[in-house]
Amino acid sequence: MKRRSCLKILLATTGMVATRAANGPVAAAADGQHPIELHLDLAVDPVKEAEMLRVFEKEFKPAASRQPGFIAIKMLKLSSTLRGPAPAGCNYQFVLSFASEDLRQKWVATPIHKATWPKIESTFTSPNYSRLLYEVY
């Protein structure tokens, strides 16, 4: 086989592996459960924004990432509205992905979650935020 052909195959294979790793698992587990994503639309007080991000990055995210079934976690800051209205007063969206809702609930029941989530929640201007749970296909 020619060197150029080998390099093309190697690069294509590496790209496929990287894409799969970045996207995470989306197939149903052996028990038939699909991964889940939890979306929260949050109104974070601008004065407390730095504190919220510090707790999220230094405490909450590392603790969540060590849990069984953890897939991904993101804190998204709204930068612009392209079409349709944004949720009223919300400037952040929290997205958490787990292999199943059962595993997410086990994480919610841990002492570290019970200690760190209230720190994040205390930075909100309102305790009334949307909680949307999605199955991932």
Predicted regions, residues:
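N-terminal twin-arginine translocation
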Residues: 1-8, 14-31
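An amphipathic, aromatic/His-enriched active-site/gating alpha helix that lines ligand/cofactor pockets
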Residues: 2, 7-13, 63-72, 97-133, ...
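Residues in and immediately flanking transmembrane alpha helices
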Residues: 15, 21, 54, 112-113
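Short, glycine- and small/hydrophobic-rich beta-strand elements in well-ordered beta-sheets
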Residues: 26-29, 61-93, 125, 133-136
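Short, well-ordered beta-strand segments in beta-rich or mixed alpha/beta enzyme
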Residues: 35-43, 75-110
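Short, surface-exposed ligand-recognition loops at beta-strand->loop->(often short) alpha-helix junctions
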Residues: 44-49
